[in-house]
Curated annotation (Swiss-Prot):
Family matches, as InterPro entries: AMP-bd_C, AMP-bd_C_sf, AMP-binding_CS, AMP-dep_synth/lig_dom, ANL_N_sf
Segments of this protein annotated with the region SBD1: 282-351
Keyword Magnesium: yes
Family listed: Belongs to the ATP-dependent AMP-binding enzyme family.
Annotated binding of (E)-4-coumaroyl-AMP, by residue: 259, 263, 329, 351-352, 356, 364, 457, 461
Catalytic function, reaction form: (E)-ferulate + ATP + CoA = (E)-feruloyl-CoA + AMP + diphosphate; (E)-4-coumarate + ATP + CoA = (E)-4-coumaroyl-CoA + AMP + diphosphate; (E)-cinnamate + ATP + CoA = (E)-cinnamoyl-CoA + AMP + diphosphate; (E)-caffeate + ATP + CoA = (E)-caffeoyl-CoA + AMP + diphosphate
Gene (UniProt): 4CL1
Expressed in which tissues: Expressed in roots, stems, leaf blades and leaf sheaths.
Keywords: ATP-binding, Ligase, Magnesium, Nucleotide-binding, Phenylpropanoid metabolism
Protein name in the entry: 4-coumarate--CoA ligase 1
Length: 564
């Protein structure tokens, strides 16, 4: 994985008054950010103050690991990862194929100590999806659980070491029994080892994202980029998100998703808060945990906000401990905000906006600040501090002023280093001046608040998950009765987003049905990528270059909906 050494484009100097570009910055003052530490040391920098405090609370068992426990166990695991048979070194890659669990957190920071990167994957993914990511990321170690282990490619077991966190199984190592022995002879990785394995621009997290177009790609997030992103949110005298060590943060969102990994796990650890870890989301169980542990901070996504807003049971629960509800991954309308706040009148509800490639947070609601600002319903915050944001005309590239919608671009040390082994996609996303082009259309109003209004990019967003049309199209055309295919998103409720819809051109004489197409895809992809509707057409509209004309398909879809 030597290409992870490719350099992030250098940031241009901050714009001056004479610059023709219109650049927006945070209302909060920039701060000094220590982003040259290894990520694990940065997140645990307050360890001497919080060592005895709860760090991870297992929502299923009630078990508690203190900050001292998490530090000790992650050091022990790091030492085990370095030893045979794993032999992990700087530049290596570990796949974390886990639901939320204490083991997820320990694995992530152990890999950071070794100088390796963690590529996070959804354990509900199909075998094909997992195998593709394993191969693309170059992972040599997989830390997983029995429910996902059977999905791993059997032919790669010689080159792949599998570690299970739950049951013992032939051919696999056991997380606790084989790697985490507590006998005195078992070494702990020390801070002095960091100097041997660390550079702030080394990759530490390798989530997969489809970006603005195409197939999933490895997003190279470095120690520097992630520590910068965390600092932008929770560091300084007046942090953008006013968290503190007395907070109890709910982790109901999957840690394999960058929102949870960064804003819940890393930010929570940075401030010394307790994190209540939910293995699997369930609305009743979530409300139980809020009551039992007096949760104060609840990072959610719009579908969960909607579920709480519509839940009759929520009114009978004591959710009064919650003081802050962060919503991200998809836009949310005012009617849902109002219905939700009726259930939690004592909480502040606000939205943020992110993109995996941006580290991921671009903007955050300033009502969460230690010294809060008034904010508007429907806004997704203002740009984070120590960063620059501009709105450009998608056709001309010219920067636009306030209240003019255009493509959102972000620049700062929090953005990705690039896409793994894909310089062309990197070049198409981060320009020569260091601006990351998001593919989202939005505007900045007179109060510096950002509103998302449309999507320039092809990616479909369903319940906060990314669905890449190109991935589904590549699968569809492998069917012997499909001559050509294209996939677009069909907007349903704003809080849910879009569903994948396929336009299919059948081979001559084919009797292929809509159910045939749906079932063919469903066997190969995770649930949120399933095709929900199929329309048969004579041919797929394409430009002379062969590029699918998705605007034409969206017009056809709109016409079909009107006819229905």
């Amino acid at each position: 994985m030597g290409s992870m050494e490719q350099q992030q484009p250098e940031s241009a100097a901050p714009a001056t008054e004479a610059s023709p570009e219109i650049i927006f910055r945070s209302k909060l003052q920039d701060i000094a950010i220590t982003n040259t530490l290894p990520l694990h040391r940065y997140c645990f920098e307050r360890l001497p103050e919080v060592a005895a405090r709860p760090c991870l609370i297992d929502g299923a068992t009630g078990g508690v690991l203190t900050y001292a426990d998490v530090d000790r166990l992650s050091r022990r695991l790091a030492a085990a990862l370095r030893r045979a048979p794993l032999g992990l070194r700087r530049g290596g890659v570990v796949m974390s194929l886990l639901r939320n669990s204490p083991e997820f957190v320990l694995s992530f920071f152990a890999a950071s100590r070794v100088g390796a990167a963690v590529t996070t994957a959804n354990p509900m993914s199909t075998p094909h999806e997992i195998e593709s990511q394993l191969a693309a990321a170059g992972a040599t170690v997989v830390i997983t659980e029995s429910m996902a282990a059977d999905k791993l490619p059997s032919h790669s077991h010689g080159a792949l070491t599998v570690v299970l966190i739950d049951e013992r199984r032939d051919g696999c190592l056991h997380f606790w029994d084989d790697l985490m022995s507590e006998d005195e002879a078992s070494p702990l990785a020390g801070d002095e080892d960091d100097e041997k394995v660390f550079d702030p621009d080394d990759v530490v997290a390798l989530p997969y994202s489809s970006g603005t177009t195409g197939l999933p790609k490895g997003v190279m997030l470095t120690h520097r980029s992630l520590s910068t992103s965390v600092a932008q949110q929770v560091d300084g005298e007046n942090p953008n998100i006013g968290l503190h060590a007395g907070d109890v943060i709910l982790c109901a969102l999957p840690m394999f998703h960058i929102y949870s990994l960064n804003t819940i796990m890393m930010c929570g650890l940075r401030v010394g808060a307790a994190i209540v870890v939910m293995r699997r989301f369930d609305l009743a169980a979530m409300m139980d945990l809020v009551e039992r542990h007096r949760v104060t901070i609840a990072p959610l996504v719009p579908p969960i906000v909607v579920a709480v807003a519509k839940s009759e049971a929520a009114a009978a629960r004591d959710l009064s401990s919650v003081r802050m509800v962060l919503s991200g991954a998809a836009p949310m309308g005012k009617d849902i905000e109002d219905a939700f706040m009726a259930k939690l009148p004592g909480a502040v509800l606000g939205q943020g906006y992110g993109m995996t490639e941006a580290g991921p947070v671009l903007s955050m609601c300033l009502a969460f600040a230690k010294e809060p600002f008034k904010v508007k319903s429907g806004a997704c915050g203002t740009v984070v501090r120590n960063a620059e944001l501009k709105i450009i005309d998608p056709d001309t590239g010219k920067s636009l002023g306030r209240n003019l919608p255009g493509e959102i671009c972000i620049r700062g040390q929090q953005i990705m280093k690039g896409y793994l082994n894909n310089p062309e996609a990197t070049k198409n996303t981060i320009d020569a001046e260091g601006w990351l082009h998001t593919g989202d259309i939005g505007y900045v109003d007179d109060d510096d608040e950002i509103f998302i209004v449309d999507r320039l990019k092809e990616i479909i967003k369903y319940r906060g998950f990314q669905v890449a049309p190109a991935e589904l199209e590549a699968l569809l055309i492998t069917h012997p009765s499909i001559a050509d295919a294209a996939v677009v998103g069909k907007q349903i409720e704003p809080e849910i987003g879009e569903i994948p819809v396929a336009f299919v051109a059948k081979t001559e004489g084919s009797e292929l049905s809509e159910d045939d197409v749906k079932q063919f895809v469903a066997k190969e992809v995770i649930y949120y990528k399933k095709i929900r509707e199929v329309f048969f057409v004579d041919k797929i509209p394409k430009a002379p270059s062969g590029k699918i004309l998705r605007k034409e398909l969206r017009k056809q879809l709109q016409h079909l909906q009107q006819e229905a």
